[in-house]
Curated annotation (Swiss-Prot):
GO terms for molecular function: DNA-binding transcription factor activity; sequence-specific DNA binding; zinc ion binding. GO terms for biological process: negative regulation of DNA-templated transcription; negative regulation of transcription by RNA polymerase II; regulation of secondary metabolite biosynthetic process; sexual reproduction; sporocarp development involved in sexual reproduction. It is found in: Nucleus. A zinc finger (C2H2-type) spans 564-588, 594-616. It comes from Emericella nidulans (strain FGSC A4 / ATCC 38163 / CBS 112.46 / NRRL 194 / M139) (Aspergillus nidulans). The lineage of its organism: Eukaryota, Fungi, Dikarya, Ascomycota, Pezizomycotina. Keywords: DNA-binding, Metal-binding, Nucleus, Repeat, Repressor, Transcription, Transcription regulation, Zinc, Zinc-finger. Residues 629-647 have a biased composition (Acidic residues). This is Transcription factor steA. Residues 56-165 bind DNA. Residues 406-507, 519-540, 618-665 are annotated as: Disordered. It comes from the Eukaryota.
Length: 692
């Protein structure tokens, strides 16, 4: 349906068909191909729903072939999707895949269980029963009940990952002879072969990596210059429905179909309109650039975890197409990230990313817009011509794929892997309060998300962070043995410093008053933070909680680079550090080089031994015992929980005498977050070893 220029390239690797060979994908029945095309249409809606909203518009719907509607809801300047609509999306995708749902209740339970990984305050908003928001969703058939529930931020939902996780659950049930929630009745589900040695998401990642070489091989031909003015598409993405008021008034709206290719040269144009208004590709130079300012030939060196379908996927913010015409890019119809300082122009709202929260919002009108927005006085891009060349655009590169959703999904413990010297295109002036002033100038306070009680506030602006850093230095050592604050905050709030900051400027997170008993509630900390971190409500309102940036500034996928591979052929797992690889190999060899001096029980990890020794010490002190099963589980679990937490990342540099401290294993993480269950003797295992 959509023309492809240049040499044919390998078909995109999609979750529904990545296990099939190229020949099998091409030979799918017509009904299956139509169903998969309908899935692509749904994906396009998930990509572009927040674009071109009217000032008074609150909801936008997409009609599924099943008769259900998927709704994108604008509420409090943020776009949302309900859990019920997420289930509807997945049920339709399973039906198009050839595995219709037969046990709806159990199917929904599995989806909502996965959605628990999207935390309130970070990837969702937690609504109280019968709140105005829930009432609006209920009246528009977005939810079935107005009970207390989470409503998810539009671009935090990992739609492809949810599909693969649900499919993997059913395939495992079938393999074990249990009843599955879906049943395979048609292609491509009947031809789908399941390899239980690794997750479907990992298999999709490897399939994309294998496909990227052939994808890049055709880059120079598929995306090269063409003499045809027909706008090209990527991966059969459907063209957007341009609003009539967005198009020049005298130019008829055209669809991007190959059958209409001859119409571009024969459209009668009125005399008052110059011919250069319809010039499309003549405005491009010999080299095209992607949204990150890279030459287009290099865009295919993407991270392997990024699906081909959303290679040009948007960041979670857009500028209205009144100023950003789709058809003037010659790549695909997806929205792209606006310049960092874009602001409100004219009567239609413009949307911009909040680099701290990963969300997007409507920008208020500013009288000094020319100082913030270098493109404000330029003509709209749909009028670009030889007289008004399309301006070069710079884009914020800290983005993640919309269909992959939040990078923190099932990766709550990952840390940023940006080197200390990496350039920071967003945050500057770490030693002055200038960033806070700049934030207030073009980021309205209503953006700031309410934080649930289970999520501790992260570091806000750099001036407050640095003043807290200085004031806590004298007391942090005294409070560390009572409660492992760094570990607790990394599990609850995932506080992260701004990308590009030096290790010495990394965070002591803003903790709750009860977590810092040695600090005065309104003393030195409050003096360093004028907005008042001594009061919980004030702290929650003074700034947004930073998103856990497991997707780093230089990487498009959520996984950091790893260079050490497991030597076991059937495993081949990759690790960032050699010590993590050695620790992982012990899970294969069952080597346990750390015996307990009390009972001679051996462990494969030193931190598990340290935790085990605390059981003996607690028994001697008359404290309640920690369940031994937790140690057994930790002894055999993978090192994914701490493979990205090196000593330099986990320990605060201002703590004297504590070096090389890593985070505690997951069984201690549960105890560290429950103050009532943790005594003053529960300290970090590495610190315990140093004391011994």
């Amino acid at each position: 349906m959509y023309s492809q220029h240049g040499a044919p390239m390998a078909p995109p690797q999609k979750p529904e068909t990545f296990m099939l060979s190229n020949e099998a994908q091409q030979s799918l029945p017509h009904d299956a191909q139509v169903a998969l095309q309908q899935v692509d249409n749904l994906k396009y809606f998930l990509l572009s729903a927040p674009v071109d909203w009217q000032p008074d518009q609150l909801i936008r719907r997409f009609l599924l072939p099943t008769g259900d509607y998927i709704s994108c809801v604008l509420w409090s300047n943020l776009f949302h999707i309900s859990g019920t609509d997420i289930v509807r999306c997945l049920a339709f995708r399973f039906q198009a895949f050839g595995r219709p749902v037969k046990n709806s209740k159990k199917f929904e339970e599995g989806i909502f269980s996965d959605l628990r990984n999207l935390k309130a305050g970070t990837d969702a908003t937690l609504e109280e029963p019968k709140s105005p928001f829930l009432d609006f969703l209920y009246k528009n058939n977005c939810i079935r009940t107005q009970k207390k529930q989470k409503v998810f931020y539009w671009y935090s939902v990992p739609h492809d990952r949810l599909f693969l996780d649900a499919l993997e659950r059913d395939l495992k049930r079938e393999k074990m002879g249990q009843e599955a929630t879906t049943v395979a009745v048609s292609e491509p589900a009947l031809s789908f072969e399941f390899d239980s040695s690794q997750s479907l998401y990992e298999q999709l990642t490897k399939a994309q990596q294998a496909n990227s070489s052939s994808f890049a091989a055709h880059a120079s031909t598929t995306y090269g210059q063409s003499a045809s003015p027909v706008v090209r598409t990527v991966d059969a993405m459907p063209p957007p429905q341009m609003a009539p008021q967005m198009a020049p008034p005298s130019i008829p709206l055209l669809t991007d179909e190959s059958a209409n290719s001859q119409m571009y040269t024969s459209i009668p144009m009125p005399n008052p309109i110059p011919q250069n208004l319809i010039k499309r590709e003549a405005d491009y130079g010999a080299i095209q650039y992607d949204r990150n300012g890279m030459p287009i030939a290099r865009i295919h060196q993407r991270h392997s975890s990024m699906p081909t379908f959303v290679e040009y996927s948007p960041a979670p913010s857009f500028v209205s197409s009144q100023y950003e015409d789709y058809s003037n890019r010659g790549l695909s119809f997806e929205p792209v990230t606006p310049p960092q300082h874009s602001s409100h122009i004219g009567p239609e709202p413009a949307y911009i990313a909040n680099e701290d929260t990963g969300l997007y919002t409507a920008i208020p009108e500013m009288s000094t817009g020319s100082g913030f927005n270098p493109m404000m006085h330029l003509p709209p891009s749909n009028l670009a011509s030889a007289h008004f060349p399309t301006p070069a655009r710079t884009f914020h590169s800290n983005v993640y794929s919309v269909l992959e959703g939040s990078p923190t999904y099932k990766q709550r413990r990952r840390r940023s892997s940006i080197p200390p010297g990496a350039a920071n295109p967003v945050t500057t002036g770490t030693h002055s309060p200038a960033p806070a002033l700049s934030y207030a100038a073009h980021k309205p306070s209503d953006l700031r998300r309410s934080v649930s009680s289970s999520v501790a506030p992260g570091d806000t602006d750099d001036s407050r962070h640095e003043s807290l850093h200085r004031s806590v230095n004298s007391t942090y050592t005294a409070t560390l043995p009572q409660k492992n604050l760094m570990h607790e905050m990394s599990r609850n709030g995932t506080p992260l410093s701004s990308v590009g900051e030096h290790r010495e400027q990394s965070s002591i997170p803003l903790t709750q008053a009860e977590d810092l008993p040695a600090l005065p509630a309104n003393g030195t900390v409050e003096s360093g933070a004028p907005n008042g971190v001594g009061h919980k409500s004030d702290r929650y309102a003074t700034g947004p909680v930073r998103r856990a940036r497991s997707a780093t500034m230089m990487e498009l996928g959520p996984y950091p680079q790893k260079s050490h591979s497991c030597p076991i052929p059937s495993c081949g797992r990759l690790f960032k550090r050699l010590e993590h690889l050695k620790r992982h190999v012990r899970t294969h060899t069952q080597e346990r080089p750390y015996p307990c001096p009390y009972c001679n029980k051996a462990f494969s990890r030193s931190d598990n031994l340290a935790q085990h020794r605390r059981i003996h010490e607690a028994q001697q002190d008359g404290q309640p015992l920690v369940h031994e099963d937790d140690l057994e589980n930790d002894d055999n679990e993978s090192v994914s929980h701490d493979e990205d937490e090196s000593p330099s990342e986990s320990v605060h540099p201002a703590v004297p005498g504590v070096h090389g401290m890593t985070s505690m294993p997951s069984s201690v993480a549960l105890q560290s977050t429950m103050g009532s269950m943790m005594g003053s003797h529960m300290i970090a295992p590495q610190l315990l070893q140093q004391q011994i």
